[in-house]
Amino acid sequence: IRQYSNLPYLFEAGTPNIADVIAFSEAIKYLDKIGMDRIHNYELDLKKYAIKKIENVNDIIIYNKNSESGIITFNIKDVFAQDLAIYLDKYNICVRAGNHCAKILKDELKIKNTCRISLYFYNTKEEIDRLVEVLNNPNLKNEII
């Protein structure tokens, strides 16, 4: 066993994950073909569209309107983030709820857990419109509680 505790043998004690290495290579080729600048610009345009739509939802609190990513972190006043995520899931809308592995930041900002939308090049304006439609449900809080 001692001989396998040093490099490079440390990483070669089992069958290499060849399929994932090949898949990772193909994923990089795919992203390069599209172009990372093009993806980033689409992501930011989509985020601007989403913010414009989402900020009109009643009782919504958006924490990062001006960040340079496709991530939108938000809460609905008086709604527990995890409950909102479960509610949205009923409409096939996926968000992440919790502290997003950033508990210290959450504590510094003095906020509770949040919901997070993570937009990328495979998302569409129609999906954002659907999210806003569901968030604008006048009975949302009653249906969650």
Region locations from a protein language model:
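Pyridoxal 5′-phosphate
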Residues: I1-I145
